[in-house]
């Protein structure tokens, strides 16, 4: 199956800002929701080009849908792909560093 080429702007969807993600930032790890078609190489290239940093490694997780219910209506959340990006020593993503 041939995979279509994603532009670097289409790889990263949004940063994940959770309590756990903020704790990981102290270890130079940043968490992003990424395009389901993206692989580790595309994520690394996108982060390096967009934020002008050097990436040490990328871990990717496929998040499964969770069951949800609202009254009698049942459904599931959507599935999505998460990337944990570890930066090399001395680099931070200034755009994501805010007061927390």
From Swiss-Prot:
Alphabetical list of SUPFAM superfamilies matching this protein: Ribosomal proteins S24e, L23 and L15e (SSF54189)
Q: Which GO terms describe its molecular function?
A: rRNA binding; structural constituent of ribosome
Q: Name one GO cellular component term.
A: ribonucleoprotein complex
Provide this UniProt record's keywords sorted from A to Z: Ribonucleoprotein, Ribosomal protein, RNA-binding, rRNA-binding
User: What biological-process GO terms show up in the record?
Assistant: translation
PROSITE patterns named in the record: RIBOSOMAL_L23
Described function: One of the early assembly proteins it binds 23S rRNA. One of the proteins that surrounds the polypeptide exit tunnel on the outside of the ribosome. Forms the main docking site for trigger factor binding to the ribosome.
| Quaternary structure and interacting proteins, as annotated | Part of the 50S ribosomal subunit. Contacts protein L29, and trigger factor when it is bound to the ribosome.
Family, per the entry? Answer: Belongs to the universal ribosomal protein uL23 family.
Protein name, entry field: Large ribosomal subunit protein uL23
Q: Which gene encodes it?
A: rplW
């Amino acid at each position: 199956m041939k995979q279509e080429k994603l532009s670097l702007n289409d790889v990263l969807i949004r940063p994940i800002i959770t309590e756990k993600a903020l704790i990981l930032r102290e270890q130079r790890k940043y968490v992003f929701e990424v395009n389901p078609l993206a692989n580790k190489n595309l994520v690394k290239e996108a982060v390096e080009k967009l934020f002008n940093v050097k990436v040490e490694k990328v871990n990717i997780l496929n998040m499964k849908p969770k069951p949800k219910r609202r009254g009698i209506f049942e459904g599931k959340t959507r599935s999505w792909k998460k990337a944990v990006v570890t930066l090399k020593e001395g680099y931070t993503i200034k755009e994501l560093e805010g007061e927390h």
